[in-house]
């Protein structure tokens, strides 16, 4: 993606985020944007909207169907995108909006990877440790199970990592022996 396109995506996303903040509907917009992203990720819609073989009217029709479950602000936002013929950028714009709203809310996904499933008490304890160590006011717990880490856990949030896995400890030990 070139710089001009990236700047365009950021400008569109910034405008909706500002409206959401101004009207105090950040969570509502975040939920709606997440639902739209889900639609894009479970369908071929991104390919259709970026295809040159599909007419502008057909693209407009697809975007109109997305608007049926959206708030007025998001409907207006989608209409502006269609009017400016930026349908091909809709998915990256939505992803950018989602990232910006996560920053605004401070609701970073806290990914915890373990070798086996955790009990609710263990999840809560690791979640609290992650929030404290990574200086996050709040977040969403996302659990992953990866037997290859052997034991321990890996916490990943806001581009920060706490790796207390047995695999990592063995790797560090191996490096010391060299």
From Swiss-Prot:
Species annotation: Streptococcus agalactiae serotype Ia (strain ATCC 27591 / A909 / CDC SS700)
One GO molecular-function entry: proton-transporting ATP synthase activity, rotational mechanism
Function: F(1)F(0) ATP synthase produces ATP from ADP in the presence of a proton or sodium gradient. F-type ATPases consist of two structural domains, F(1) containing the extramembraneous catalytic core and F(0) containing the membrane proton channel, linked together by a central stalk and a peripheral stalk. During catalysis, ATP synthesis in the catalytic domain of F(1) is coupled via a rotary mechanism of the central stalk subunits to proton translocation. This protein is part of the stalk that links CF(0) to CF(1). It either transmits conformational changes from CF(0) to CF(1) or is implicated in proton conduction.
One Gene Ontology cellular component annotation held by this UniProt entry: proton-transporting ATP synthase complex
Record key words, sorted: ATP synthesis, Cell membrane, CF(1), Hydrogen ion transport, Ion transport, Membrane, Transport
Chief location category: membrane
Protein name as annotated: ATP synthase subunit delta
Lineage of origin: Bacteria, Bacillati, Bacillota, Bacilli, Lactobacillales
Topology relative to the membrane: Peripheral membrane protein
Similarity remark: Belongs to the ATPase delta chain family.
Compartments where found: Cell membrane
Subunit structure: F-type ATPases have 2 components, F(1) - the catalytic core - and F(0) - the membrane proton channel. F(1) has five subunits: alpha(3), beta(3), gamma(1), delta(1), epsilon(1). F(0) has three main subunits: a(1), b(2) and c(10-14). The alpha and beta chains form an alternating ring which encloses part of the gamma chain. F(1) is attached to F(0) by a central stalk formed by the gamma and epsilon chains, while a peripheral stalk is formed by the delta and b chains.
Gene3D superfamilies listed in its UniProt record: N-terminal domain of the delta subunit of the F1F0-ATP synthase (1.10.520.20)
One Pfam family named in its UniProt record: OSCP
């Amino acid at each position: 993606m070139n710089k001009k396109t990236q700047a365009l995506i950021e400008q569109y996303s910034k405008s909706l985020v500002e409206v959401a903040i101004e009207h105090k509907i950040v969570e509502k917009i975040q939920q709606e944007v997440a639902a739209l992203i889900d639609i894009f990720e479970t369908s071929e819609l991104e390919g259709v909207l970026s295809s040159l073989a599909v007419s502008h009217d057909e693209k407009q029709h697809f975007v109109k169907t997305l608007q049926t479950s959206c708030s007025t602000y998001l409907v207006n936002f989608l209409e502006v995108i269609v009017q400016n013929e930026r349908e091909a950028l809709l998915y990256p714009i939505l992803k950018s909006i989602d990232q910006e709203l996560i920053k605004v809310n401070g609701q970073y996904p806290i990914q915890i990877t373990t070798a086996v499933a955790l009990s609710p008490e263990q999840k809560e304890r690791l979640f609290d440790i992650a929030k404290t160590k990574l200086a996050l006011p709040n977040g969403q717990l996302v659990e992953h199970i990866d037997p290859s880490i052997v034991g321990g856990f890996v916490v990943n949030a806001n581009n920060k990592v706490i790796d207390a896995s047995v695999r990592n400890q063995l790797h560090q030990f191996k490096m010391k022996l060299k």
